[in-house]
Amino acid sequence: MTSQLITRLLPINSTTSPSIYETIRQYDDDSGHSDTEERAAMAVDEENLDGAYQDYELEGALAQASDTQSTHSSFQSPAAGDSHLPRHPKWTQESVNEAEHDDEVPASLLVEGDGEEDPLPPPPRPPSNRNRILDDAPAAEFCSPRLRGQWEAAEEHQTPHLAPQPSPPLNLHSNRRAGLAFANPKEKAMWRWANVENLDNFLKDVYIYFIGNGIWCIVLSRMLNILTLAFVVGFTTFLTNCVDYRKVPHSKTLNQIIVPKCTNKMSASSTFFLWLFTVFWFGKVFQYIIDFRRLRHMHDFYLYLLDVPDSDIQTISWQEVVGRLMALRDANPATAGTVSTKHRKYIGSQSKQRMDAHDIANRLMRKENYLIALFNKEILDLTLPIPFLRNRQLFSRTLEWNLNLCILDYVFNEQGQLRPLFLKATHRRALSEGLRRRFIFAGVMNIFIAPFIVAYFLMHYFFRYFNEYQKNPSKIGSRQYTPLAEWKFREFNELWHLFERRIHMSYESANMYINQFPKDKTVQLSRFVAFIAGALLSVLALASVIDPELFLGFEITHDRTVLFYIGLFGTVYAVARGVVPDDAQVFDPEHALLDVTAYTHYKPAHWQGKLHSDDVRKEFATLYQLKVVIFLEEILSMIFTPFVLWFSLPKCSDRLIDFFREFTVHVDGLGYVCSFAVFDFKKGTNLMPPEPQHHRPRGLKHGLHDLRGDYFSAKDGKMLASYYGFLDHYAPPARPSGPHASQRQNYPQQPVPGPTHRAQPGANHLHSSRIDRWDNGQHSTMRQSALRTSRFGAITGVGGHASPMASMLLDPHHQPSMSGFRSKAHPTAASRYRPSRQAHPMADTIQDVDEDQLPGINIQPSNVTTTSSGGPATDDSQIEESWRINLAEDANSGEDDEAEDVEKVAGGGGVLGLIHQFQKVTNEGRGAVGM
């Protein structure tokens, strides 16, 4: 209901063209018949789908086909024929004829005939004294003439027998449901799993149940949330309406200042909103009670099908849950056995065969991936339309909620699928105008809602943090990442709990970086204030210890006792002391920021060479704000959000519509997803190192090609960082050797840096020199090993050893291929998802060169080999910065450098070098190396 609020409230101008919402609804209804991409592209295992038909469903389908054909004309149009039982599913229409000779039963005997255009003729009417089964028998097209003749011959030699007419499929289905009431919980859970119709919503429930730590933790959390809501509103009402503050100075008990029957004396507006809140509160309670049944079903799914009890759900990893989901999929591959015609329209995007770690992440983050891309491409205009704040961006949880309501609920339908109408350029203007109206309408709604939300959050923040700040004043200076920073740092297909873990690990490094910069004037003033406040506090504390009964009641100023000043000076001392940095801290802001980016994976190109500057610190400080400042910005955003919705966001409505059309791809069995979220594992996401500038053809045409490539690629290496981050979460934890070892990084396993870590000058020097070599754009050559693909999809070498990149949580078509990491001398194939997209640059490996190495010695790339024993042979320190993409281009390299790179890829050394390598490989018993 919330997702359709703006759609239903916006007026429709009947005097002009039809509303875009009417067009969207009509196109959604007709998309199952008109979307040629859905019909052609969705390819799912035909046998699994046909295997879902049961006997009673086949009988019901035949009966319905006979009834329908007897009442309709044989000259029915093809469009009307679609209203009958579905024929071949959309993803099997092309593969039926190819696989017909392999089936035991020919396609002519199946319910779903081959004819896509011609309707079925009415069945022949048998004599009345014949078997009743023949009345419901299929037409001649449902069986071959030979089988039909055998059937009639058998009927002539046997006594007619009136068999009971099969019940309608609805009654049989109802009886099957009634039988589930007496089944055991495991059978019930299996039946629900087999009849899942919307896999996106089901997997979302599975993930919410996982991060909620089980049924009882979720129930307790919901109860405490509604009780907290009731307490904040009730206590605020009591403080504002039931206390006579004029009597406080002259009263000694609470009863003297309480207003009797205060609710009867409340204003009409306060009474109305209190009743409105009461209705909302009881509605939430009723919703939670109704939702308990769904939680119970999810509890049974985890317990009986995944074998994960509530006692283990807090300790089991999500990767283990994904593995058990894949095992359950392999054990029960069929989709829902009985689905309606309406649901079969989009069943191609609900295939349970497409359910490995990559597909599950794409389903769970179908909408979030688009938001991540929007922030990465900087398409959203979030600047404040105020003269003195035009360069400042405003983004808060309130604005995030409005973006979901205005954009995502506009682009996606009720089933969570992207509306196909947004992929048509013909409706661009109407869709853009509809989005513009949604922004304006949401701004108007925020004006009426903002006062109540501001009051609630102010009271909630006051009740929650005042006592904490009063006891520990140093926490006033604590920081956290802003909502805008979270969307900039989050990667494609990165689930929330994995992202939250990665970001939490960066807090210590971020605090160290903020405290690194010289603030000598502030530090000197803070030390002076801390000294004065500490001296006064020590004297008062010592006097109160000597004679507490006399001195604690002593008034230093009018009505201000010693106890008051002890608390005041203690607070001032704590705040001033918190500003002064630790004396043992080592000053190295560049190294500290590199430690932060190792976790956040965020390092814009304009930061290059400026990590020590104050400009970079100011930019990072806007992403890592004080908690108090974030709260104040959240409150102020409720006031300024309508202006952003009215003036800033409508300017980018055209770009938003173009974005969803140009960055959406269709994946078989998965549906429409963001193009950046589809990782091409076989080609290493097509990420290749860029060519030097002087090797590129010059001219206007190539300049336009570069602009197009930049437009269709992610900024700041987001695509490659997401790819490696995904492999780190779902690939084996052991780091492989060879080319991939220098490209991947196990982010959560990095040690948290500290003062002891920085105090090692040797490690610091090696770390800095390695980063310098990386940032200077030195390309290291990589040897492409002779690889072959096993029948299970894992990449194996010539010796038969499995690829270290293979993962049990990825299907064979998603297994990463080491052959995808090629040298820049080899051309890369275009992506099958968007042929026009330019290949992304691949991150360069970090080449560690010994300091005592002579400059004249040429080390062949064949020395950096992939160990066949499976043990890691790569320095772990190389992985520390491997997630970055080197976007800089070396403009000083010449033709000799390119020739040298090609020679290195080929193995170097000419014919003698090749003979030497062949002898070496033969002696060591390995496959071809460096060929």
From Swiss-Prot:
<keyword id="KW-0813">Transport</keyword>
<feature type="compositionally biased region" description="Polar residues">
    <location>
        <begin position="65"/>
        <end position="77"/>
    </location>
</feature>
<feature type="compositionally biased region" description="Polar residues">
    <location>
        <begin position="740"/>
        <end position="749"/>
    </location>
</feature>
<keyword id="KW-0812">Transmembrane</keyword>
<dbReference type="GO" id="GO:0005789">
    <property type="term" value="C:endoplasmic reticulum membrane"/>
</dbReference>
<keyword id="KW-0597">Phosphoprotein</keyword>
<feature type="topological domain" description="Cytoplasmic">
    <location>
        <begin position="582"/>
        <end position="627"/>
    </location>
</feature>
<dbReference type="GO" id="GO:0005776">
    <property type="term" value="C:autophagosome"/>
</dbReference>
<keyword id="KW-0968">Cytoplasmic vesicle</keyword>
<keyword id="KW-0333">Golgi apparatus</keyword>
<keyword id="KW-1133">Transmembrane helix</keyword>
<comment type="subunit">
    <text>Homotrimer; forms a homotrimer with a central pore that forms a path between the two membrane leaflets.</text>
</comment>
<protein>
    <recommendedName>
        <fullName>Autophagy-related protein 9</fullName>
    </recommendedName>
</protein>
<feature type="transmembrane region" description="Helical">
    <location>
        <begin position="272"/>
        <end position="292"/>
    </location>
</feature>
<feature type="region of interest" description="Disordered">
    <location>
        <begin position="734"/>
        <end position="780"/>
    </location>
</feature>
<feature type="topological domain" description="Lumenal">
    <location>
        <begin position="549"/>
        <end position="560"/>
    </location>
</feature>
<dbReference type="Pfam" id="PF04109">
    <property type="entry name" value="ATG9"/>
</dbReference>
<dbReference type="GO" id="GO:0034727">
    <property type="term" value="P:piecemeal microautophagy of the nucleus"/>
</dbReference>
<dbReference type="GO" id="GO:0030659">
    <property type="term" value="C:cytoplasmic vesicle membrane"/>
</dbReference>
<feature type="region of interest" description="Disordered">
    <location>
        <begin position="854"/>
        <end position="879"/>
    </location>
</feature>
<keyword id="KW-0445">Lipid transport</keyword>
<feature type="region of interest" description="Disordered">
    <location>
        <begin position="816"/>
        <end position="840"/>
    </location>
</feature>
<feature type="transmembrane region" description="Helical">
    <location>
        <begin position="528"/>
        <end position="548"/>
    </location>
</feature>
<dbReference type="GO" id="GO:0061709">
    <property type="term" value="P:reticulophagy"/>
</dbReference>
<feature type="transmembrane region" description="Helical">
    <location>
        <begin position="561"/>
        <end position="581"/>
    </location>
</feature>
<feature type="transmembrane region" description="Helical">
    <location>
        <begin position="215"/>
        <end position="235"/>
    </location>
</feature>
<keyword id="KW-0072">Autophagy</keyword>
<dbReference type="GO" id="GO:0000139">
    <property type="term" value="C:Golgi membrane"/>
</dbReference>
<dbReference type="GO" id="GO:0034045">
    <property type="term" value="C:phagophore assembly site membrane"/>
</dbReference>
<comment type="function">
    <text>Phospholipid scramblase involved in autophagy and cytoplasm to vacuole transport (Cvt) vesicle formation. Cycles between the preautophagosomal structure/phagophore assembly site (PAS) and the cytoplasmic vesicle pool and supplies membrane for the growing autophagosome. Lipid scramblase activity plays a key role in preautophagosomal structure/phagophore assembly by distributing the phospholipids that arrive through ATG2 from the cytoplasmic to the luminal leaflet of the bilayer, thereby driving autophagosomal membrane expansion. Required for mitophagy.</text>
</comment>
<keyword id="KW-0256">Endoplasmic reticulum</keyword>
<comment type="similarity">
    <text>Belongs to the ATG9 family.</text>
</comment>
<feature type="region of interest" description="Disordered">
    <location>
        <begin position="62"/>
        <end position="133"/>
    </location>
</feature>
<dbReference type="GO" id="GO:0034497">
    <property type="term" value="P:protein localization to phagophore assembly site"/>
</dbReference>
<feature type="topological domain" description="Cytoplasmic">
    <location>
        <begin position="649"/>
        <end position="931"/>
    </location>
</feature>
<feature type="intramembrane region">
    <location>
        <begin position="439"/>
        <end position="459"/>
    </location>
</feature>
<dbReference type="InterPro" id="IPR007241">
    <property type="entry name" value="Autophagy-rel_prot_9"/>
</dbReference>
<feature type="topological domain" description="Cytoplasmic">
    <location>
        <begin position="293"/>
        <end position="438"/>
    </location>
</feature>
<feature type="topological domain" description="Lumenal">
    <location>
        <begin position="236"/>
        <end position="271"/>
    </location>
</feature>
<feature type="intramembrane region">
    <location>
        <begin position="628"/>
        <end position="648"/>
    </location>
</feature>
<dbReference type="GO" id="GO:0006869">
    <property type="term" value="P:lipid transport"/>
</dbReference>
<feature type="compositionally biased region" description="Polar residues">
    <location>
        <begin position="859"/>
        <end position="871"/>
    </location>
</feature>
